[in-house]
Curated annotation (Swiss-Prot):
It comes from the Eukaryota. The active site is at H125 (proton donor). Phosphorylated by NEK2. The lineage of its organism: Eukaryota, Metazoa, Chordata, Craniata, Vertebrata. Inactivated by binding to URI1. This is Serine/threonine-protein phosphatase PP1-gamma catalytic subunit. It is an enzyme of class 3 (hydrolase). CDD domains: MPP_PP1_PPKL. PP1 comprises a catalytic subunit, PPP1CA, PPP1CB or PPP1CC, which is folded into its native form by inhibitor 2 and glycogen synthetase kinase 3, and then complexed to one or several targeting or regulatory subunits. PPP1R12A, PPP1R12B and PPP1R12C mediate binding to myosin. PPP1R3A (in skeletal muscle), PPP1R3B (in liver), PPP1R3C, PPP1R3D and PPP1R3F (in brain) mediate binding to glycogen. PPP1R15A and PPP1R15B mediate binding to EIF2S1. Part of a complex containing PPP1R15B, PP1 and NCK1/2. Interacts with PPP1R3B, PPP1R7 and CDCA2. Mn(2+) 1 binds at D64, H66, D92. Its main location: cytoplasm. One of its GO terms (biological process) is cell division. It comes from Canis lupus familiaris. Binds 2 manganese ions per subunit.
Length: 323
């Protein structure tokens, strides 16, 4: 446990932020024992907090980042670096982009520094069988070693799975599950755990909404299901919720509504993989649960960032008075 005891979080965050303003792509090479310490300490914190987080607004919610470190820095510049704002990230920190290590290290460092104000959910890429293939394993092996990748795996296996904001907004990476009847089922999932090939945990990280599906449908991903608008409406009604907030799919404007604004998809990696001309978005939830969207245009476009008008959820949602 020496790695944890000697961890200088402020120094690590400072070095990770030093590349602000540099040409995108410049690496920050932390010491291996520092990264190991980040994994071990954050793992402790994840396990000390619920697998189904109960959070309070105001906070900012972000979708997939996928190793696009300089876009993550732009998100923080736009939304406010912690602790100026509270954050909830919906998973998929690693793979595909060029700087998964910087991305996950900064996020874990902020989790350690501000454990009650900064929250990270698990995405389907925080899973050994996926990030072994899509880039994170290769990045760890090239810049450090395979043992460090395995340390990250142990950390990812302890991430929380879902969050509920002020008893009204249900957040997860993928979507709903035909197995999900009670929130208690999520709370009963034991950590550490890998992501199974099917079932509740798999679906929460993998499923997608589909406007052409009635009920539950098959998916092109070959994992989990798609679900229609009626499934969303029934779920919200049953659990007295107002909105599902999820990530997992590239959307052109960085956010996209579904099922009469009862579900929103967030994607926070602009110009994803350099192949899509998508914007990235972050959803700000204020104390009254009014939601607005902050948009990151692809960096190459050199257009100013735009703020979309405030969007009420299904009319105006009033924040529950604290008992």
């Amino acid at each position: 446990m020496a790695d944890i005891d000697k961890l200088n979080i402020d120094s690590i965050i400072q070095r990770l932020l030093e590349v602000r303003g540099s040409k995108p792509g410049k690496n920050v090479q932390l010491q291996e024992n520092e990264i190991r310490g980040l994994c071990l300490k954050s793992r402790e914190i994840f396990l000390s907090q619920p697998i189904l987080l109960e959070l309070e607004a105001p906070l900012k919610i972000c979708g997939d980042i996928h190793g696009q470190y300089y876009d993550l820095l732009r998100l923080f510049e736009y939304g406010g670096f912690p602790p100026e704002s509270n954050y909830l990230f919906l998973g998929d920190y690693v793979d595909r982009g060029k700087q998964s290590l910087e991305t996950i290290c900064l996020l874990l460092a902020y989790k350690i520094k501000y454990p009650e104000n900064f929250f990270l959910l698990r995405g389907n890429h925080e899973c050994v069988s996926i990030n072994r293939i899509y880039g994170f394993y290769d990045e760890c092996k090239r810049r450090y070693n395979i043992k460090l990748w395995k340390t990250f795996t142990d950390c990812f296996n302890c991430l929380p799975i879902a969050a509920i904001v002020d008893e009204k907004i249900f957040c997860c990476h993928g979507g709903l599950s035909p197995d999900l009847q009670s929130m208690e089922q999520i709370r009963r999932i034991m950590r550490p755990t890998d992501v199974p090939d099917q079932g509740l945990l798999c679906d929460l990280l993998w499923s997608d909404p589909d406007k052409d599906v009635l009920g539950w449908g098959e998916t092109d991903r070959g994992v989990s299901f798609t679900f229609g608008a009626e499934v969303v409406a029934k779920f919200l009604h049953k659990h007295d919720l107002d909105l599902i907030c999820r990530a997992h799919q590239v959307v052109e404007d960085g956010y996209e509504f579904f099922a009469k604004r009862q579900l929103v998809t967030l994607f926070s990696a602009p110009n994803y993989c350099g192949e899509f001309d998508n914007a990235g978005a972050m959803m700000s939830v204020d104390e009254t649960l009014m939601c607005s969207f902050q948009i990151l245009k692809p960096a190459e476009k050199k257009k100013p960032n735009a703020t979309r008008p405030v969007t009420p959820l299904r009319g105006m949602i009033t924040k529950q008075a604290k008992k």
